[in-house]
Amino acid sequence: MATIKIPPVLRASVGGEKEVSASGANVGEVLRDLATNHPATESQLFSADGQLNRYVNVYLNDEDVRVLEGLDTSVGEGDTLVILPAMAGG
């Protein structure tokens, strides 16, 4: 299982937890497992076509998955994913 660090903006969707565990062989599967176990996160993470929302950044062991293999990036036992929704301001 991988550990997912949950940002404050998503914590209400996972019962207030700062970290949750999820299973999967790659980033996409781990995030889908998160969405299965915490359905309120699905629309916050994924677009209608099943792709990761463009404003959501995901890091695997401090590496941006966009520069790795995206949602196909392999996840090993004990790995940590960090979800960081992009923030905009003015």
Q: Where does each model-flagged region fall?
A:
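Ubiquitin-like/PB1-type beta-grasp interaction modules and other compact soluble beta-rich domains
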Residues: M1-G89
